Amino acid sequence: MVKKFLLIWCLCMPWCLYGQKVKDVELNIVFIGNSITQGAQLKDPVQEAPPVQTVQWLQKQGGIDRVNMSNQGVSGLTTVDFLPASQTFFPKVKMAMEALQAEHPDATLLFSMMLGTNDSANSGPNGSPVSAPQYYTNVKAIIDELMDSFPKALFVLHYPIWYSPNTYNGAQYLVTGLKRLQSYYSQLQALVNDYAQKHPGQVFLGDTEAPAYFETHYLEEFNPEQGRAGIFYLHPNKKGAESLAAFWGKAIYEVIQ
């Protein structure tokens, strides 16, 4: 009798589960970044900035109910500007997430970060040039403080994207700056590995493919800008912002699956 009951239960259970809908994910995302995140050089950054298009990309994917976001990208900023101790831009990031959380209390909290472009400059931006070890220390300080305030939040760290080796506007980047930028990649990987030991399942390596992609497609997807060392390429145009958003979106989507 017991065996017969178990057999009937096993046969019926898949149909019962099939009828149950898994709840879709709602996200609160705060984007941390510089002019690229902000949408500089775009005609309509409110509609075209990478964070806006990342949200649009995510909302087209299965399993996503709603994405609420705040764009905290600010032109010219470095990891130094976002350090908690500076009490300048870090409080704004924290307040942005608190506002999203107050309005959408059941949503998953996620910080999407792409910093490093201005850190890598030879001169100009605050704290530049930032060495690779110092970059690690700065990003860790930002994450640690945010993690204290939002213990369940997820963190997705994207590689800062490529720029042309003659980039020189108000800040000087050039070849040495680009090499410094690329030295940050291993630091991000090290950070993720370290957090995996202490806070497993919270800090993830985000997009790693955009730098190589834009190095190949910069003529079509970056705005040409006149600089002190000729025409340089630093900021994505509308098409480039869409491509970057897709890279970010895929990385974030993989994390929440």
Across the structure, where does each feature detected by a protein language model lie?
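Serine-esterase "nucleophile elbow" of acetyl-processing enzymes
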Residues: 19-73, 102-103
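Structural recognition of the beta-strand scaffold that forms the well-ordered cores
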Residues: 28-33, 37, 68-73, 109-115, ...
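Surface-exposed cleft-lining segments at the edges of enzyme active sites
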Residues: 40, 79-83, 118-135, 173-177
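Charged, often glycine-rich, active-site loop that binds/positions anionic groups
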Residues: 75-98, 219-230
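Oxyanion-hole/transition-state-stabilizing segment in secreted/luminal serine hydrolases
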Residues: 87-134, 163-164
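Substrate-gating cap/lid alpha-helix
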Residues: 163-209, 238-241
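Histidine-centered active-site loop/cap adjacent to the catalytic His
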Residues: 225-257
